[in-house]
From Swiss-Prot:
Pathway, per record: tRNA modification; tRNA-queuosine biosynthesis
Disulfide bonds: none
Catalytic activity from the UniProt record: 7-aminomethyl-7-carbaguanine + 2 NADP(+) = 7-cyano-7-deazaguanine + 2 NADPH + 3 H(+)
Protein name: NADPH-dependent 7-cyano-7-deazaguanine reductase
UniProt superkingdom: Bacteria
Oligomeric and partner information: Homodimer.
A Pfam family that the UniProt record links to this protein: QueF
Amino acid sequence: MDYKDNSLKTLKLGQKTDYIANYDRTLLQPVPRALNRDGLGITKQQPFSVGADIWTAYEISWLNIKGLPQVAIADVEIDYRSTNLIESKSFKLYLNSFNQTKFSDMSEVQRTISEDLSICAEGNVRVQLHSLSNYSHERIADFAGECLDELDIEISDYGFNAEILQNCTALSTEIVEETLVSHLLKSNCLITSQPDWGSVQIHYQGKRIDHEKLLRYLVSFRQHNEFHEQCVERIYCDIMKYARPEKLTVYARYTRRGGLDINPFRSNFEAIPQNLRLARQ
């Protein structure tokens, strides 16, 4: 399926747009998850049973009743079972529309964002706003696990290729549980081709996955065009197909753009983690 021949034509992403300073929920634009899941064969039933698109919104401001500007940071969780994901530029424009709008308090802003995102996503959305003083305890974290990035390998082909994972467990004779991490994940925006930089954590139980093959596979996303959420679901499906682990979690955290970072989490056995902040976020 060519995504750009369908509903993505109407997205504001990659187009010149006006910045609206007064609240307007219609600025939010959905992207059907089925556009990517159809190609993966997982539209009706996903191989993961837990998941969310975890967003951090750093640029939220509104006016209080007296007209004094207020600021906050938001944690947002959009359930993986929602019909749509939220297009990121539209989310940015939507948040900007709060700038010159009066709200009674932070709770009203939080409730408004939660309701609007739920309608756009057609699914469950959780929103938690934090004052800057309450956010001051947040520290730079790191993904737990063994980092693959120091492997001494040579790469000359950067085209996406899931078949790199073929026979990735052929040398394994026992079931292991391990957590693997790479900070070399890079893909490109589906619409604008702008680079998206991320770190990925893979926690699995099953036959041991060849570390070199896995790193080569992750690097092959380097010139691949897909949204963050779609990349994580593709990684999950490819590992399931070629490694067949009993348990699997794929969690990626991408760098911030437009005051937003997007951090998709998919698992068949672990709960959604508390939002954190990596070094590049």
